[in-house]
Amino acid sequence: MPDRAADGRDGPPGGSAAPEDLYARARAICLRLLTRAPRTRAQLTDALRRREIPDEVIEAVLDRFGEVGIVDDAVFAEAWVDSRHAGRGLARRALAAELRQRGVDEDTVRAAVDGLSPAQEEATARQLVRRRLAATRGKPTEVRVRRLMGMLARRGYSAGLAYRLVREELEAEGVEVDFPSPEEG
């Protein structure tokens, strides 16, 4: 059975151990968290503070992890954008909000979401609309439009893009659409 104190799950609170023990404990906590899922520097900092690790130990551990490339918010942000855009169809706005929520700084967020082109974003939104249209055939047009607009809004797409794509895809199905675009009021 592994020693729980050695891996940072139990043991004395942060302030009562020797600095070397605190460093080893913080390192073990970070490594355990990182084996489950990638984390940002801010997420690791929060986790260590909850375990009463002193700030100077946190900085030392995370600086070292940054030097060797174990913790890199820019790499995390790029991977997050690629994964969440491909998997969930999230738009740049929603992706940026998720990254900010995870403690990624604004410049890194901007760089990561700028890697997603407007053409990619539109193509993904169009795929989402087509998939949802197929699932809502037979329902009244108003219901379909409302569901499509809500889905795109929840994923962070602008109202202008959403209206345009919904209109184009419904017209491609031969459905007469008569709803104002956001620009028309």
UniProtKB/Swiss-Prot annotation:
Alphabetical list of Pfam families matching this protein: RecX_HTH1 (PF21982), RecX_HTH2 (PF02631), RecX_HTH3 (PF21981)
Any one GO BP annotation for this protein: regulation of DNA repair
Coiled-coil features, chain-numbered ranges: none
InterPro entries associated with the record: RecX_HTH_1st (IPR053926), RecX_HTH_2nd (IPR053924), RecX_HTH_3rd (IPR053925), Regulatory_RecX (IPR003783), WH-like_DNA-bd_sf (IPR036388)
Cellular component, GO annotation: cytoplasm
Subcellular location: Cytoplasm
Primary residence: cytoplasm
Keywords associated with the record: Cytoplasm
Role: Modulates RecA activity.
Similarity comment: family membership: Belongs to the RecX family.
Xref: HAMAP family: RecX (MF_01114)
PANTHER family assigned to the protein according to its UniProt record, in alphabetical order: REGULATORY PROTEIN RECX FAMILY PROTEIN
Protein name: Regulatory protein RecX
Annotated source species: Thermobifida fusca (strain YX)
Taxon lineage: Bacteria, Bacillati, Actinomycetota, Actinomycetes, Streptosporangiales
